[in-house]
Amino acid sequence: MFVNIHRNGAMGVPPKCTRQIVHHHTKMGKIMADLFEKKIIFDLECYPSLFVLSALSLETGEMQSFTSPRDAYEYVRANGDALFIGYNSNAYDDHIINFILGVNGECTASDVREISDALINDGIPVRINRFRSYDVYDPIEAGMRSLKMFCGSYGHTTYDSPYSFKDEREYTPAEVKEIVGYCEQDVYYTRDVFNNEFGYYEAACARVPVLQEYGISFDDPRRVVCCRSAALARNVFSAMCTNGRSPKDDARTTIKFAIDYTTREGIGDAYAFYRNIVEKGDELSSKEEFYNKETPTVRLLDGLDVALGWGGAHGAIEGYVKPDDVKILYADVSSMYPTLMIKHDFYPYTFTPHARGLYEFLYHSRLTYKKQGEKLKSQAAKRLIASLTGMLKDKFAVFRSEWSNNSITINGQLSVTDLAYQLSKHFRIVQVNTDGVMAEVKSGEEETFRRIVDEWCVLYKYEVSSHEVKELVQLNVNNYYMVDEEGVTVKGASFSLNRDYFNDKAVCKKALPLSVVRKCDPLEIMKDINDIRDYLILIKTTDTFPYLYDTLSGECTESRCIRCIAAKPNGQLAKLAGVRFVNYVKMRSSKDKSNTQKVSDFPTCAVELPDDLSTYDTDALLALLDKDFYAQKVRTLAQPFQEKKEDARCLFALDLSSVQTSPKPLPYPTDAHTTAFVFDRVRR
């Protein structure tokens, strides 16, 4: 293993870095302990008779492409000290490169294709990495595995190769050049994702000094950057934990309860539900039976139902808007699961004292780093802790202890429901989530709220941050818009503003909570929103309907993601803006125009926009824009709130500038053939 544990040695000193890292087209700020001088963005394509590797040096900006495994082998070997950066490469590209390195490049495109088919059809084998790689997709967890869809959301017009991956024929030089162009396009897209999500890379670098401070060193610290958080946590903790599964690891002996819940009013039935499962459970119990049992619901004194489940406790007033005559206080538990593990001794039996020591070090360090403003270190420690807790159910982890994990989650549910019930004796509960409770508190009742929370904290040994929620628009527990002392928080698809690249009709997500809070028509809100990017509508194809057909021009485009805006049917304004009207439908085949599917929620009149809007007259586009189309969408979405909270009024007007949704325009390669290829290519 590459982990060296020095239990009594001197603590490692985090290396300092004052160097400026400059990426191709993008200047990044200082980063912590960047362990790689050379970074290369790469992508590859595997056809039955053609292999392509394209690689872009971030330091020099040079793009190189190779069409034989041998040439690719020589390039990777010559850059053995570099970090190779791919998109979703952990699942595919890394395995291909490792195969080529393993046979010293002595293979054909057909041999590589066999490995590719095995990866796709038979799953991912255990990989021994022969080079250093970093997957930009892995930490993002965007739920969008397609790179082209991802960058289509950025605003790029994206294309797929017109050549089938099942086509076994030889390609002409012109066709090879075209396929290489597609591969290079994906490299530039990966570059953009890496630059925009650079904080994840910085956090990966921060793992090294965090673990060094505990006395853990590494034979090759650069491998730490390449590891997923889960893999690193598994590696580090496995070296400290006992091996094998104990016969005592069952529900009866492992699931513990933090307090005597029989003394707590209101949650007796929920406790009895779990207690009954535990008393009947053992190692031979069917896990399916254990998890498929219908979990209980607790009704609070104010009538709100809190549903308990293996993922946490949840309850919320649906269609809620904060009134102006009360304040909402939010009791938010800090690091609930680690706190239960440490302060109630819910450690798995596999943890040695040294493993416990590291876990507690990460727990306390994360809080210390956060207070000191060291966000990268705090985030690195947080991810290691979260990964470790989740891996207690991982059948491949040496330290796995499934029932220990259940012990943590069950007590988390019971304890937060207990707090909600105690608060419901005095206050109206607005929301209950996995690690916190929101309640309406009238003026003069704040001390009662804090007293109940403080007593609860002493009982469960929690630390809670209680703060005021200034504004709340809540569709349900999974969809809400909140403004508090930390800024704007959004959750769920209805209000999602937290990922800049998911900006499809972002104006609707901005205007919905603001129009409800201010009790005004969405058009009034939209008068002040004049960034054309907030009005973009993304049209994404599917595997079933992979083509987009414009019924007005009769053209079929290969683009996997097109962006448009709703427009007024005014040809003169369109001409002044330099755009044309489009009406897209999806097609199964580019040759069969009868087999189409309507694009959901597509405006009657629309214009298509490219990724670079800098050459367009913004005033002309705004004059053409049909804001009423978007306002009508918001009116429909706002109906549940207006029906349930017609008397809601706003305490203050929200500052629109506090919500940032539109990404900055991204630079694109200036290489002539690539630029022309990306912007001008419309086939068939």
Q: Language-model features: where?
A:
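Helical catalytic core of nucleic-acid polymerases
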Residues: 137, 141-147, 162-170, 174, ...
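C-terminal, non-catalytic extensions of nucleic-acid polymerases
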Residues: 261, 294, 303-310, 378, ...
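Conserved RNase H-like, two-metal-ion catalytic cores of nucleic-acid enzymes
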Residues: 27-119, 289-290, 294-301, 305, ...
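Active-site-proximal helix-loop-helix substrate-binding element of RNase H-like nuclease domains
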Residues: 84-89, 94, 105-187, 385
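Intrinsic-disorder-associated, low-complexity terminal segments enriched in Asp/Asn/His/Tyr and depleted
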Residues: 4-6, 23-25
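Conserved "right-hand" nucleotidyltransferase catalytic core of DNA-directed polymerases
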Residues: 29-34, 45, 153-161, 167-338, ...
